[in-house]
Amino acid sequence: MAEIKRHEIKYIISLREAELLKYRLRALLRPDPHVRADGSYFIRSLYFDDTDYRAYHEKIAGVKERTKYRIRFYNMDDSRITLEKKSKDGDFSGKESVRISRELAEAFLTGGEALRDTEEHARELARLRQNGWKPAVLVDYVRYPFVYPTGNVRVTIDTELRTAPFKTNLFDDRALTVPVLDEGEAVLEVKYDAFLPAPVRALLEGVTKQRCAVSKYTKCLDILE
């Protein structure tokens, strides 16, 4: 997996501000090419942690450099599943991502035969299991993504954040989940490479927002305690 590192800043905004911001973003940025007709896609992620929940506690403690793993797919489509390693170093985030099959994803969860494959991705998943990483929590949300080529900018608005303990089929579209964000809230994320272009910065400055170290993973675990 090849890592891509970039700036990542997160905010909590109101749903009202989210609607206004989507309107403004459409005038300057392009929607991600993979969105549905309404400009969004549905994301399901399964986060892993070890038996001591190290990834969770490092985030809560504010450890500067930390790592977590997840399996992710979109719109409940199992034809494109990714295994992702997310790393954080202050305001910088990195992501390494590889495509895996549904068979391999399910084998990781059950310890199935596919993990004995010699393929690199299978070996990576087998190594995670051997090191004690296990499914921790299911995270669902709807994302409205926008891109701007200069600075490789990506602005996303996440709504309908919901969670469940992982006790079900990862691909069950009727999994019983509970809401995580306070009513009327959304998450705004801004990612870019070396700099944030002035037009995008000016657009975002017009939004009432509260910067915070939002972690969907830790928020979801907290809700389930």
Regions found by a protein language model. Give the residues of each.
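Phosphate-end processing signature that detects enzymes handling 5′-triphosphorylated RNA
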Residues: M1-E225
